[in-house]
UniProtKB/Swiss-Prot annotation:
Keywords: Cytoplasm, Methyltransferase, rRNA processing, S-adenosyl-L-methionine, Transferase. It is found in: Cytoplasm. Its EC number is 2.1.1.186. The gene is rlmM. GO terms for cellular component: cytoplasm. The active site is at 306 (proton acceptor). It catalyses: cytidine(2498) in 23S rRNA + S-adenosyl-L-methionine = 2'-O-methylcytidine(2498) in 23S rRNA + S-adenosyl-L-homocysteine + H(+). It comes from Enterobacter sp. (strain 638). This is Ribosomal RNA large subunit methyltransferase M. PANTHER family: RIBOSOMAL RNA LARGE SUBUNIT METHYLTRANSFERASE M, RIBOSOMAL RNA METHYLTRANSFERASE FTSJ DOMAIN-CONTAINING PROTEIN. One of its GO terms (biological process) is rRNA processing. HAMAP family: 23SrRNA_methyltr_M. Catalyzes the 2'-O-methylation at nucleotide C2498 in 23S rRNA.
Length: 366
């Protein structure tokens, strides 16, 4: 198996392809990406047969911006016989995967592919039983073993392969299933909720999204992102010239500051979270975020970068590199991650967690 299949948002196949080609080459894995416009996936074909496994093992999935999922795959199975689709799939996986811990029968996130969802659900149970019988799957689900993927791109056509639970998306199709809360002021609230799921391990939520924390929301109106912070019982300074939803103001946890988010400067030094979803050029937002981080005005931040029409991967890479350079210049350690979330559109969401350097009034964190 010498291919890596990557799921992505339809319309962003070129960005996904540019990213995997670039980051694979940095690890001395060379190949070429097969791209079909608006397909919702990319196939990166490695020149060396073992390099696909190397890539899926060693390239941190968390470092990918435009991919929702990645797995090692073999040749495309075509024209599966309607009377027996299971045998060719089972045959393709035998000798490749031994005792996988989970099975995901998936499709791309397109309207055309979604018509196959009912079929995928129907196929999953008998396919799981057949794969257990031949040892491709264990007799019980376990997160300690590889995930077996069967990815249908059309009726009777699928890629088969595997990913590692330590380096993949835990979500079916790479998409967290979130429900829009009826009392939220806007649908943008789902962006921040998804970002929490993607960037913060579930076992760290109680510590890093704790009751009583202080947070700032830049460009907050009408309050979709503030809602997520209030929901976690934080005290929020919501900065925007536009009004906040009255339901949020009634909680008593929100202070509305009628100011421009780019001009606002915090007056307290115990802010844990700063979040920002402003419609502005990405370079301008990146510069503002770097200012907050370098000055130690917050401990963690989640913000959106709106994407241009062309060279979107290059633009995001430049913005992230700028933030990293500003932090490096001050000797500040930080963890930077970016992802085009399911609820994002022409944008990517960035998370930065700062590890405190020597700034007055701060304790050192290692």
């Amino acid at each position: 198996m010498n291919k890596v299949v990557l799921y992505c948002r339809p319309g962003f196949e070129k960005e996904c392809a540019a990213e995997i080609t670039d980051k694979a080459a940095r690890r001395e894995v060379f190949g070429f990406a097969r791209v079909k416009e608006n397909a919702g996936y990319v196939v990166f074909e490695c020149y060396q047969p073992d390099d696909a496994d190397k890539l899926v093992r060693e390239l941190p999935f968390s470092s990918l911006i435009f991919a929702r999922q990645m797995f090692v795959a073999g040749e495309l199975l075509r024209d599966l016989p309607p009377e027996d689709r299971i045998s060719p799939i089972s045959g393709m996986l035998q000798g490749v995967v031994e005792k996988g811990g989970d099975l995901r029968v998936e499709v791309a996130d397109t309207n055309e592919s979604k018509e196959l969802m009912k079929f995928c659900r129907k196929l999953t149970v008998p396919l799981r039983a057949a794969l257990r019988e031949v040892g491709v799957l264990t007799n019980y689900e376990t997160p300690k073993r590889p995930v077996v993927h069967v990815f249908f791109i059309a009726p009777g056509c699928c890629y088969t392969g595997y990913s590692y639970t330590t380096n993949n998306s835990p979500f079916y199709m790479g998409i967290p299933r979130l429900r829009f809360p009826s009392d939220a002021p806007s649908r943008s609230t789902l962006k921040l909720e998804e970002a929490f799921h993607v960037f913060i391990p579930a076992d760290e939520w109680d510590e890093r999204l704790a009751n009583g924390m202080h947070a700032v929301d830049l460009g907050a109106c009408p309050g979709g992102w503030t809602y997520q912070l209030v929901k976690r019982n934080m005290w929020v300074a919501s900065v925007d010239n536009g009004p906040m939803a009255q339901s949020l103001m009634d909680t008593g946890q929100v202070t509305w500051l009628r100011e421009d988010g780019f001009r606002y400067r915090p007056t307290r030094n115990n802010i844990t979270w700063m979040v920002c979803d402003m419609v502005e050029k990405p370079a301008k937002v990146a510069a503002l975020m770097a200012t907050w981080l370098v000055n130690g005005w917050c401990r963690e931040t989640i913000f959106n970068l709106k994407l241009p029409m062309k060279k979107r991967y290059e633009e995001v890479s430049q913005n992230l590199a700028y933030i990293q350079e500003q932090l490096n210049a001050q000797g500040i350690n930080a963890e930077i991650q970016a992802r085009q979330l399911y609820h994002d559109r022409e944008e990517v969401t960035v998370h930065v967690r700062r590890w405190w350097a020597a700034v007055g009034g701060r304790r050192d964190e290692r």
